[in-house]
């Protein structure tokens, strides 16, 4: 199943919330993304059926290996793109919003170049 942007956003939100809180419920995801609980329920059903997440009997969400891989890829893109934008003088809030838009559409090759460029900046080679 090909994930749409929203599916990637849900997986990224679960990853971020897990890092912050240790455990994640649908209501946490709704708050993080600013969507309704019914919207989250529909999305979680689709992500479960696609094998990206599991939900235990207490309603706790977990990423499967497949879901973890997607979430990590999107979250890395988000962080790198936001850092590059802030390095260009974009404020943190705008950089985060723009990174969220770009992270879904940028090619792997272009992202690799951006990541390498940021590493050169951090290493003092630029």
Please report, for each region that a protein language model flagged, where it lies by residue.
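Residues within the alpha-helical elements of helix-turn-helix
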Residues: 32, 70, 87
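C-terminal regulatory/oligomerization modules of transcriptional regulators
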Residues: 97-126
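N-terminal helix-turn-helix DNA-binding core of bacterial DNA-binding proteins
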Residues: 2-35
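Basic, amphipathic "hinge/linker" alpha-helix immediately C-terminal to the N-terminal HTH DNA-binding motif
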Residues: 59-77
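Canonical helix-turn-helix DNA-binding module
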Residues: 26-57
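DNA-binding alpha-helical recognition surfaces that contact promoter or target DNA
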Residues: 12, 42, 97
């Amino acid at each position: 199943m090909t994930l749409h942007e929203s599916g990637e956003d849900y997986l990224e939100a679960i990853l971020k919330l897990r890092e912050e809180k240790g455990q994640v419920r649908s209501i946490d995801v709704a708050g993080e993304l600013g969507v309704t609980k019914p919207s989250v329920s529909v999305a979680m059903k689709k992500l479960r059926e696609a094998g990206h997440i599991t939900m235990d009997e207490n309603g706790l969400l977990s990423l499967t290996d497949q879901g973890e891989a997607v979430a990590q890829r999107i979250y890395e893109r988000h962080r790198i793109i936001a850092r590059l934008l802030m390095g260009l003088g974009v404020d943190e809030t705008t950089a985060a919003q723009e990174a969220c838009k770009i992270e879904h559409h940028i090619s792997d090759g272009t992202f690799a170049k951006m990541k390498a460029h940021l590493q050169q900046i951090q290493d003092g080679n630029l």
